[in-house]
């Protein structure tokens, strides 16, 4: 079973449970945008392919994306909490060689960013 559900937009409401400071979420928009920009490149590549199975090069990029998420998590506790609560490492691992899985992951990341923007008073 995939970590990211069919209703990934509803699942993205996990943002509501992130730790907050006095003026908004501990996770900054910049920190989230770093993770989102890493996924955007993969989204573009996956969309160009009609094959339901990811090519080796793209699977390697998904694995490298996991490394980058781990690295960013190690740099900032707010990112680590976000990655854990949103189950992003598990979701990346669950992609395997599925093109649809990668596209769903990328859309989930976009949904997370959208909810952060919507809910964070600093972004208004």
From Swiss-Prot:
Covalent S-S links between cysteines: none
Repressor as UniProt keyword: no
Pfam families assigned to the protein according to its UniProt record, in alphabetical order: Csm2_III-A
InterPro entries the UniProt entry points to: CRISPR-assoc_prot_Csm2_III-A
GO biological process, alphabetically ordered: defense response to virus
Effect of deleting the gene: Deletion of the entire CRISPR-Cas locus (cas6 to cas2, Rv2824c to Rv2816c) decreases resistance to plasmids encoding spacer elements about 6-fold.
CDD domains referenced in this protein's UniProt entry, alphabetically: Csm2_III-A
Organism superkingdom: Bacteria
Keywords, sorted A to Z: Antiviral defense, RNA-binding
KW Ion transport (keyword) present: no
Single Gene Ontology MF annotation: RNA binding
Family membership noted in the UniProt record: Belongs to the CRISPR-associated Csm2 family.
Note: Encoded in a type III-A CRISPR locus.
Quaternary structure, from the entry: Part of the Csm effector complex that includes Cas10, Csm2, Csm3, Csm4 and Csm5.
UniProt function note: CRISPR (clustered regularly interspaced short palindromic repeat) is an adaptive immune system that provides protection against mobile genetic elements (viruses, transposable elements and conjugative plasmids). CRISPR clusters contain spacers, sequences complementary to antecedent mobile elements, and target invading nucleic acids. CRISPR clusters are transcribed and processed into CRISPR RNA (crRNA). This subunit may be involved in monitoring complementarity of crRNA and target RNA.
Protein name, as recorded: CRISPR system Cms protein Csm2
Gene: csm2
